[in-house]
């Protein structure tokens, strides 16, 4: 599966849980949340645009860092 890395403005465990919730709802993803560095690495066949739109549902500032 392709890996994608995103920067997400997460400040606490609650922020990380919000990211987990939207990604689990999307389905077809495996992900790792790096809260101290505010990064989310996602393994998924979904497009980076789909993943970005999904992460934007958290209300946090999100940017696509590129393939990993």
From Swiss-Prot:
<keyword id="KW-0186">Copper</keyword>
<feature type="binding site">
    <location>
        <position position="12"/>
    </location>
    <ligand>
        <name>Cu cation</name>
    </ligand>
</feature>
<dbReference type="GO" id="GO:0016531">
    <property type="term" value="F:copper chaperone activity"/>
</dbReference>
<keyword id="KW-0007">Acetylation</keyword>
<keyword id="KW-0479">Metal-binding</keyword>
<dbReference type="GO" id="GO:0032767">
    <property type="term" value="F:copper-dependent protein binding"/>
</dbReference>
<dbReference type="GO" id="GO:1903136">
    <property type="term" value="F:cuprous ion binding"/>
</dbReference>
<dbReference type="InterPro" id="IPR017969">
    <property type="entry name" value="Heavy-metal-associated_CS"/>
</dbReference>
<comment type="similarity">
    <text>Belongs to the ATX1 family.</text>
</comment>
<keyword id="KW-0813">Transport</keyword>
<dbReference type="GO" id="GO:0006979">
    <property type="term" value="P:response to oxidative stress"/>
</dbReference>
<feature type="modified residue" description="Phosphoserine">
    <location>
        <position position="47"/>
    </location>
</feature>
<keyword id="KW-0406">Ion transport</keyword>
<dbReference type="Pfam" id="PF00403">
    <property type="entry name" value="HMA"/>
</dbReference>
<dbReference type="InterPro" id="IPR006121">
    <property type="entry name" value="HMA_dom"/>
</dbReference>
<keyword id="KW-0143">Chaperone</keyword>
<feature type="modified residue" description="N6-acetyllysine">
    <location>
        <position position="60"/>
    </location>
</feature>
<keyword id="KW-0597">Phosphoprotein</keyword>
<dbReference type="GO" id="GO:0051117">
    <property type="term" value="F:ATPase binding"/>
</dbReference>
<dbReference type="GO" id="GO:0006878">
    <property type="term" value="P:intracellular copper ion homeostasis"/>
</dbReference>
<feature type="binding site">
    <location>
        <position position="15"/>
    </location>
    <ligand>
        <name>Cu cation</name>
    </ligand>
</feature>
<dbReference type="GO" id="GO:0006825">
    <property type="term" value="P:copper ion transport"/>
</dbReference>
<dbReference type="GO" id="GO:0043066">
    <property type="term" value="P:negative regulation of apoptotic process"/>
</dbReference>
<dbReference type="InterPro" id="IPR036163">
    <property type="entry name" value="HMA_dom_sf"/>
</dbReference>
<protein>
    <recommendedName>
        <fullName>Copper transport protein ATOX1</fullName>
    </recommendedName>
</protein>
<dbReference type="InterPro" id="IPR051881">
    <property type="entry name" value="Copper_transport_ATOX1-like"/>
</dbReference>
<dbReference type="GO" id="GO:0060003">
    <property type="term" value="P:copper ion export"/>
</dbReference>
<keyword id="KW-0187">Copper transport</keyword>
<comment type="function">
    <text>Binds and deliver cytosolic copper to the copper ATPase proteins. May be important in cellular antioxidant defense.</text>
</comment>
<comment type="subunit">
    <text>Homodimer. Interacts with ATP7B. Interacts with ATP7A. Interacts (via dimer form) with SLC31A1 (via C-terminal domain); this interaction improves ATOX1 stability and controls intracellular Cu(I) levels.</text>
</comment>
<feature type="domain" description="HMA">
    <location>
        <begin position="1"/>
        <end position="63"/>
    </location>
</feature>
<dbReference type="GO" id="GO:0005829">
    <property type="term" value="C:cytosol"/>
</dbReference>
